[in-house]
């Protein structure tokens, strides 16, 4: 395995260097991880930690355009993040809670950000509204104590798989499947795109990926 692939700890929550999903049987490497929070009455309150895992073919896909670029260049280039978001490879995103949140509390903010993005790019129609409703329904019975996680599995064909875990382990079954490419992309867009909820995660991706992109052939195998 590439030496540059290491685990990351965010607020005592560990993100392993490689994870294998029991849903797909595939392994994914950790692209980056970071905190997400809000400034409330002048204080920055950390709510969640987000880790973005990528299928190994992501390296070759991204290297075609971004090999040789520095971390500083990538951090300032929105197209780099958009290529992660829209790239023809699977992503597995783990959002683990630093503070307790109910499913509806958490999903409401995610949905607000997704809908705002979809409307801004003109891709919010009836199908997307229906997909967002399905998204909301999936979170209704869920509660997230500290350390609990949501997993978003994003496939290149636009399927978003949701699963919920009381800890950081990947569940064997998904709680919901949302078949809408625009909505699936919007979830990651709001995390690392133009109006990212986790600048920390964006910095981490830009810091870690250049070494991999410059290395060339990369396979984690399974």
UniProtKB/Swiss-Prot annotation:
It comes from the Eukaryota. Its EC number is 5.5.1.6. Pathway: Secondary metabolite biosynthesis; flavonoid biosynthesis. Changing residue 48 to A: Strongly reduced reaction rate. It catalyses: a chalcone = a flavanone. Optimum pH is 7-8.5 with 4,2',4'-trihydroxychalcone as substrate, at 25 degrees Celsius. Substrate binds at residues 48, 113, 190. InterPro entries: CFI (IPR044164), Chalcone_isomerase (IPR016087), Chalcone_isomerase_3-sand (IPR016088), Chalcone_isomerase_bundle_sf (IPR016089), Chalcone_isomerase_sf (IPR036298). GO terms for biological process: flavonoid biosynthetic process. The record marks 106 as: Important for catalytic activity. Catalyzes the intramolecular cyclization of bicyclic chalcones into tricyclic (S)-flavanones. Responsible for the isomerization of 4,2',4',6'-tetrahydroxychalcone (also termed chalcone) into naringenin. Part of the biosynthetic pathway for all classes of flavonoids, a large class of secondary plant metabolites, many of which are brightly colored. This is Chalcone--flavanone isomerase 1. The gene is CHI1.
